[in-house]
């Protein structure tokens, strides 16, 4: 592999953060994460305006927030300087945070949106997603969801249709 990797021992994940079960703590795992192939930048975005820089890999974190420092909304953009002439949007929950850096070599910009209420509102986004796609010149859209946000959930049945307009 061309990717350099690092590991975090004692990784507990999101489920542990929600219930702090001692049984889960006994099942701690090793998390392997991969560094981007080229230097990358990440920004919190409202509409098309970059509001603040965020880390692509937050190696000071010892949990799932190592990936992009966690979820930020209403939008996030990753730039890797690959000059492909293409942009993409990933509609995702937090699982997209681990996957987005792998898509950077194929796009100028990787945009991300998480429609869960704590991260997204049309007011904070200053408009709808369809307009955002047009303004950012996005050609491809990926949907990356964990099982808990997948088929048959409110994310798919309500949040996505309501916010993609």
Question: PLM features: what roles do these ranges have?
Answer:
Residues 1-165:
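Extracellular glycan-modifying ectodomains
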């Amino acid at each position: 592999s061309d990717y350099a990797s690092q590991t975090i021992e004692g990784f507990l994940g999101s489920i542990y953060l929600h219930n702090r079960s001692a049984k889960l703590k006994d099942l701690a795992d090793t998390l392997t994460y991969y560094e981007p192939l080229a230097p990358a930048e990440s920004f919190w975005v409202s509409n098309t305006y970059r509001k603040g820089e965020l880390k692509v890999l937050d190696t000071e974190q010892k949990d799932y927030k190592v990936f992009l420092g966690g979820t930020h909304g209403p939008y996030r953009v990753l730039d890797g300087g690959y000059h492909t002439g293409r942009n993409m949007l990933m509609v995702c929950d937090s699982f997209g945070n681990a996957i987005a850096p792998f898509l950077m070599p194929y796009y100028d910009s990787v945009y991300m949106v998480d429609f869960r209420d704590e991260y997204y509102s049309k007011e904070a986004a200053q408009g709808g997603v369809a307009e955002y796609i047009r303004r950012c010149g996005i050609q491809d859209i990926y949907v990356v969801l964990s099982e808990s946000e997948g088929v048959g959930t409110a994310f798919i049945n309500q949040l996505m249709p309501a916010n993609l307009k």
